[in-house]
Amino acid sequence: MSKTHLQHLYYVFGTDVSRFGNFIGEEVEESEDDSQHGIDADAYVYDDYPEEAPEATGQELMEIDGESLPDNGYAELTSCVDEGPSNAVILHEDKQYYPTAQQVYGVDVETMVQEEDAQPLTEPIIAPVEQKKFTIQEADLPPVFFDRSFMTDLMNFPEQIRNIAFAGHLHHGKTALMDMLVLETHDITDRLEKKTGKKRDEQLRYTDVHMLERERGLSIKSAPMSLVLQSTRGKSHLINILDTPGHVNFVDEVASSLRLVDGVVLVVDVVEGVQVNTEQIIKHAVLEGLPLTLVVNKMDRLILELKLPPTDAYFKLKHVVEEVNTVIEATLPGIGEKRRLSPEKGNVLFACSSMGWCFTLQSFAKLYSESYPGSKGNKGIDSQDLARRLWGDIFYNPRKRSFTRKPVEENAKRSFVNFVLEPIYKLYSHTISASTDELKNVLAKLGIVLKPSQYKTDAKVLLKLVCEKFFGPSNGFVDMVVEHIPSPVEAAELKLGRYYTGPMDTGVARAMHECNQDGPLVIQISKLFNTSDAAGFRSFGRVMSGTARPGTQVRVLGEGYSIDDEEDMSMATISDVWIAETRYNIPTDGVPAGNWVLLGGVDNSIVKSATLVPPVLPDKEEAYIFKPITHFTESVFKVAVEPINPSELPKMLDGLRKINKSYPLITTKVEESGEHVILGTGELYMDCVLHDLRRLYAEMEIKVSDPVTRFCETVVETSAIKCYAQTPNKKNKITMVAEPLDQGIAEDIESGKVSIKSSNRVIGKFFESNYGWDLLASRSIWAFGPDDLGPNILQDDTLPSEVSTLSSLARTPESTKRLIGPFMLTYR
């Protein structure tokens, strides 16, 4: 009650009243009549109006805190005063001290009275502006040592493009190798030191942008980078690189990445050699038909940690190379020799990514040819001839200045030890142990000049500076990639033959085969990257033909799409087109065929992978998809989840849908009991999934059950009773029997030793020679299930003499397909 209201009551009562409306003075005795009739004293508010009190005008009565209300605001009140004393009983609910909302705002205004606060106390009335950021992003485009317009021009020449992936075991140096290339092309060293305090001897880890990747020190997601690099000839190439995780739990990221590349750069730690995950990746890449190149990384560990003599270091290097070749030969017996890796072929790179150097035999031989260019009478050193003599059992005779296959003396050194390893050993030892004056003299002979302040830096920083000056840029890496990994045009035939489900004689197939940027738009999507605030996703894929431009309308064909079943299809419009650079994205007007592209606006209907095509293809051709990604592991680690607050179940379901998009091999489903189950590859994988579910996508607390292993049913003995099905017209009948496979068949199918795509003759010969099947049984295999690498076999065990009608019918492609479909669905 305001001050003005109280003042008005003073006039009405004619008695002193306190600020709370209580009487001040002697207590008035209650009359007997009033007590008997139970009349409240408040009913006489307007009675006994004192004559000596000055009459208040209507305007004064309507003044509230100095502001006037409409004249009708106190109509009832003033009328009561004008009438004088009254004996009328005014009930409490009929009293009116304030005007109604209708009287204040008018008849035409609808007013609503909220008697209870519907907003919970935990929710602020004015919520603060939240800026969520779960990944590291560059605020602006960082400066680079090449012109970005030149990079976009290179995208129009598929012959100058190479699409590769860095793959290997955990902590073998893939991300460090990427850092070396990033620092070579990006002018960010000084900026990082000023803004983050990161020293020159600390690993940059440029492609580790997820918060978990930074905390745990390992890569979880694949990270793309597009860089312009030069070869030893000075020719620029656009190298698109995917840095893949090395942990065995995250090989699903590797499989998704290999679908978009034309070759694999295998990174192996020279000390640890080929590990289990390395072996898995080699087998998968070989079975997918991808060319392999090898990077023997962390060469400095031989010098600084193991302290091996140069001769022993050579044998260690040779052993690592032969380990890789052994796995290739075991995967493809008889064909491995053609795909052999060897330094003299130029497909093996020696590197120390932490020190920022790498070389092939050809690039190291070029250092000698540049140091000894020759004169008029002296031809000088031919780098190609020298490179061919720098590996294997080839020895140098210093007396005759020639190379021999046999050692001249007992302790003769191989040419690789003499010309490659010993200079590196000496460079390391002088840089670490020599005094400043001695080091200056040694470096002066090599043509290396450093600032005086650089000699006073830490030994590790100084060693990195010296190595970068000595070896120069990574031209040897570019030479290896350009020479031994095909361009998108050269690899198109292999890609289409393995992954495209449509015919090869159509206009769309020809456009993809030629990487025609003017052809119909076809994009293969294999990965989804969440935005920095985790509110949405962007689709990452490869443009197979045409040019991806913003505003283009496309059909999004899911993994289950086919000509017969078009349910898994939706329409979308490409809102944005970027060149993906992990920490930043370069917006562009179009990305032509042969390149990788990051798209916005098409992710709503994509779960794992998809194919994007125009709404209508030229000549009204049918649209076909690329096959779903083949993974070389399974999700067998299972947990059940539920929200702590049951009302947050919709938020959890939305988070599970986003988790399903983010992780390629994650599986989410609802059991018959109603519990929500998540299936992953391992404990670390599941830990990352649950972290993202809690913090990134659902932002809620969940309860998680104890982890269990997924179990699958199998057949242990032949069916005792034949199972049959009959058509409605009773004229056709099919009978089936289940029996276990011989030991080892499932492993051979899953490893790719036998393929259902091979001819009946090849398949029959395999089962006949390896498992003793008869010729008829081995050539009667219809399908492997539930996919081409599935451990189940559908076999036609009918004899023409017994059921000639069914046998002839079953051998038609249409009827066979109708039988194979339910078989695949059953075992899925």
How would you label these PLM feature ranges?
Residues 2-4, 10-11:
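Long, acidic (E/D-rich), serine/proline-rich intrinsically disordered low-complexity regions
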Residues 9-26, 30-828:
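Structural and coupling elements of P-loop NTPases
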